[in-house]
Amino acid sequence: MRVRRFLFIISILFFPLATNAQTPSQPAVVRPDGGTSGRMESIFIPPNAGAPFSLTLVTEWSRPLGNGGTFILTNQRRIVRDSRGRIYQERWILVPKGGDIKSRMDVFQITDPEQHTWYNCETATKVCQLLKYHLTTEDNFQPAIGTSGPLANGKGSRQHEDLGVSSTDGVDTHGYRETVTINPGVMGNDKPMVTTREFWYSPELAINLISIVDAPQSGKQVFTAKDLATLEPEPNLFVVPDEYKIVDKRDE
């Protein structure tokens, strides 16, 4: 709970950094990667139309130990989007890196911006909760690009860096780094607390193909896309299997 509260506060400090281009009729939608809310949030996938892809997302979460070492959890999961903006995502459990425990898929999710539906399906029970999906293909999704300057009331400072252009798994990306420094005493800290967020954004796909979030209380989260393809995926991925029971939760 303390980690979640800390990440919430950090997200508020990062939020003023967003100075993205907007249209008068459609404000920009900005969502940073990382964090936890019962489940690791990972990278944000918007329902952009006309930009299909499939990839495997590799996650590593390093947390500090009291003796100066680190404890690393990892997984790999599949993410797919079609030209209509529908998204299929697998959720695999995080397991110790290099250990004997094998990761497994425990949840898969299917979202449809046209039907405004979100199926959250548990593999153990073969039950899908049908929820409302509020994002649309008309939303103006933009990367969370900020500016440098002091935080309000002398609480610290923020720094924005443009890392230039590169190529990630054969796709052009633009890199950015945001650093927030919290002064001693602001959050019960006796030394400056530094949180960094680096990401490599693909304008073509409107997603981050590499994202690194490093916070003092939650550790370091690294998300890396691999096996990226920009072809139209199989349509059966966006259909709930017959053996799954659907429970409609949209009115709750």
Q: Can you say where each PLM-predicted feature lies in the sequence?
A:
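Bacterial N-terminal signal peptides
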Residues: 8-16
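Extended soluble regions of mature proteins
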Residues: 23-252
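Sec/Tat signal peptide C-region and signal peptidase I cleavage site
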Residues: 17-21
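Bacterial N-terminal signal peptides that target proteins for export
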Residues: 1-8
